[in-house]
């Protein structure tokens, strides 16, 4: 039974506060779960060094191999897998290049579609947009 008197505001607020803990988004935000377990530590993007170029198998019902790079993050040394979007994008990226990675925009920060275990995608290579390098609009910077 919920109080409904003229001065019941404080009690109503207290009850609402209690029920907020049933919302998983509220719980994740309050307990700062993303910052604790995310390799990017809650940041939208991070830079790192390419360790190796590899590929992963697509998930069913699709088939094929997706080109990815293993990146060691500068901020904490963790190694993550990043997707290289676009046709021929893997040819532009070399080992020991500095890349900027962003989230791949999957549900709740997870992997997207048929790409298993890959949560990030490459955005910049040595400070230049991967899309423009791929299309040949700009040349790759010498390091």
From Swiss-Prot:
InterPro entries: NA-bd_OB-fold (IPR012340), Ribosomal_uS12 (IPR006032), Ribosomal_uS12_arc (IPR022863), Ribosomal_uS12_euk/arc (IPR005680). It comes from the Archaea. GO terms for molecular function: rRNA binding; structural constituent of ribosome. Pfam families: Ribosom_S12_S23. Transmembrane segments: none annotated. One of its GO terms (cellular component) is small ribosomal subunit. SUPFAM superfamilies: Nucleic acid-binding proteins. One of its GO terms (biological process) is translation. The keyword RNA-binding applies. With S4 and S5 plays an important role in translational accuracy. Located at the interface of the 30S and 50S subunits. PANTHER family: 30S RIBOSOMAL PROTEIN S12 FAMILY MEMBER. Belongs to the universal ribosomal protein uS12 family. This is Small ribosomal subunit protein uS12. It comes from Nanoarchaeum equitans (strain Kin4-M). The gene is rps12.
């Amino acid at each position: 039974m919920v109080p409904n008197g003229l001065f019941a505001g404080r009690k109503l607020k207290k009850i609402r506060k209690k029920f907020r803990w049933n919302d998983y988004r509220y719980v994740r935000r309050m307990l700062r779960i993303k910052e604790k377990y995310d390799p990017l530590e809650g940041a939208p993007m991070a830079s790192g060094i390419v360790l190796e170029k590899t590929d992963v198998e697509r998930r069913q019902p699709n088939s094929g191999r997706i080109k990815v790079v293993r990146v060691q993050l500068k901020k904490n040394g963790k190694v993550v897998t990043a997707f290289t979007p676009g046709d021929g994008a893997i040819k532009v990226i070399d080992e020991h290049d500095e890349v900027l990675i962003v989230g791949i925009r999957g549900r709740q920060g997870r992997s997207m579609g048929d790409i298993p275990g890959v949560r990030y995608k490459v955005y910049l290579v040595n400070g230049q947009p991967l899309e423009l390098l791929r299309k040949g609009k700009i040349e790759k910077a010498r390091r």
